[in-house]
Amino acid sequence: MSELHNPDQSSRALFDLCRVLLKGIYGELSAVLVGSLLDYGRQTAAELAKTTKLPLSAVHSGLAALVQNRFVLYWANDRKSGRDTDDIGESSSIHYVANWKEIYQVVRAGGMVDAVRKDFGKGPGGKSNPESGERCAEIAQNLLVYGHMRVADYLEATPEHDRDSVEASIAVMLRKRFLVPVQAWQFKPETDLYARMFRDHLSKLPLSMAESARKNQAAVSAKTELERMQEERNSLNLGFVSGSVARTKGVPVLNRAEKLDHQAVLCANPDKFLVIARNEELAKLAEERCGKTAAEVYRQCLSKYVGRLHSCTQDTSPGAEFNITSMEIAKTIDPRLDGLRPRGKGSRSVSPRPQSKRVKTEEGYTKTGDYDEKEVDVEEDMEEELSGVALATAVSKQMQILAASPLKFVQSVGTKGGGEWYVNFKEATECLRGARYEQIIQWKYGRVAKRLLRAVKDKGKVDEKLLTNIALLPVKEILNHLHDLHSVGALDVQELPRTADRAASRTIFLWHHRANRAYSLISQDIYKSLSRCFERVAAERAKLPILLSKLQREDVKGHEDEFLTEQEKADLKGLRMREEKLLVQMNRLDGLIRVFRDY
């Protein structure tokens, strides 16, 4: 169960980032309300009005918009009985809690829209379909802006001539889980849901049981019920009026006759975006370590999991549902890729088209003989079939390279279909985190510091003398790097005094690496960098208030060349360039947050 106020993840730097995000996009009121909830915890509307010194009407107005986007969650209690209630009325006391996870998704809104545009911009056979991509991207963007929306309301606001195509796009996005239905429990804190389930299960257990046994059993039952409720959200039937979903070899097969439920309330699914982003990040790491050919093969392998996984936290295990064969990869990969061209029997390069025989005439070899066209066609068909097998063999060789890597990209689990492979995402992402952290250490402190960090990770706990032998460097130089690594939390030191006076000369210092602590500390630095980037964007825009207000005029939109002066065009170009650089930097920083926190 995830916690809204986990001390390892919810920090002052993250809270400051949430304020900056809301202030820049949703206004000062939203930032003040969420800031108060982050600082003081759950509060009622009256308590918020008191802590923020805002009118109660303004607090209610701001909370309505925040709850719609699930930036703020609520929990209702009956004032008389004090019990939890789902019926909100005059006798209800409603408490509000800030949901920093949804607030942070604002950073990724642009990336999610681009992912939708890229995925749906490809038609059958890999052909480009930009119209479909733009239409689906617009749907995703609108849902990200408004938080959630009923299908009937969205279609009603759509021009009549576009409704059929928009409805079809929504249905496809729902089938692929880029959109998911919103359920009532998603507007409530998980901690409160768990507490209510725990009390319900505890009250049903007999009092004859030991108190500790009753609490343990109630906790297990509550956790199971909460997980089951969350899993129901991933049901492929949700959002459709009728029809069933069959499964073949663990892969969902969707009934195209199903009708979209116009009363369903939908929202964008950030978990699907994380699955796609994780695949791309793993493929980039494979390219760095194993080459472009192996990385492209790995990218195709990972793409097979997109339809089988609904989130990065989903448990997987080797089996028919999550095993990928070399033949499956060979069907979608480009056979012209360097390193995959078949060699040997079955290859066109080795088995060329039969040459025409020259016929001897009275004047010499002047004419060419004919050959049987049917025989050549049969041979070419055999070559095509053999080339498919040879391609699968070449794919299998690249997968073996990935399986042999110490970064645990993939595991070999069988020989079916030219070779069966399974990606253990937990191990692969843990190796990804370690590799990216070492990369950051190298950027900041150099290769020697990275080498020392690797040595400590391999050996567990080591002292300076052992590190000197491993790194082949003098003690003084090693100590300087160790102190740098200790200052950023990459290494911790344990003191083992050999005497009671704890003298430094008689103390053994053991250096070790705690991965979770190191990743948490580096995440705080990244949050601070993201906050500064957003503040810098706001500061750059504040320098040109008149120009930006002019761009908002209806007569200027789309006619900038006509209404803007040369100086204004130059200022606008400079602003766009600075914004682009900052946005690229923010995207890279968010990529690191995904690696260290979300995968």
Curated annotation (Swiss-Prot):
Q: Which InterPro entries match?
A: POLR3C_WHD, RNA_pol_III_RPC82-rel_HTH, RNA_pol_III_Rpc82_C, RPC3, WH-like_DNA-bd_sf
What S-S linkages are listed for this chain? none
Report TM segments: none
Identify the keywords attached in UniProt to this record, alphabetized: DNA-directed RNA polymerase, Nucleus, Transcription, Zinc
Q: Where is this region: Disordered?
A: 335-371
Enumerate the GO terms in the molecular function aspect: single-stranded DNA binding
Where found, per UniProt? Answer: Nucleus
Report any one BP term from Gene Ontology: DNA-templated transcription
Q: What are the Basic and acidic residues biased-composition ranges?
A: 359-371
Question: What does the record note on quaternary structure?
Answer: Component of the RNA polymerase III (Pol III) complex consisting of 17 subunits.
The entry's function note states: DNA-dependent RNA polymerase catalyzes the transcription of DNA into RNA using the four ribonucleoside triphosphates as substrates. Specific core component of RNA polymerase III which synthesizes small RNAs, such as 5S rRNA and tRNAs.
Tell me the PANTHER family matching this sequence: DNA-DIRECTED RNA POLYMERASE III SUBUNIT RPC3 (PTHR12949:SF0), RNA POLYMERASE III DNA DIRECTED -RELATED (PTHR12949)
Q: Spell out the family assignment given in the record's similarity comment.
A: Belongs to the RNA polymerase beta chain family.
What protein name applies here?
DNA-directed RNA polymerase III subunit RPC3
Organism taxonomic ancestry? Eukaryota, Fungi, Dikarya, Ascomycota, Saccharomycotina
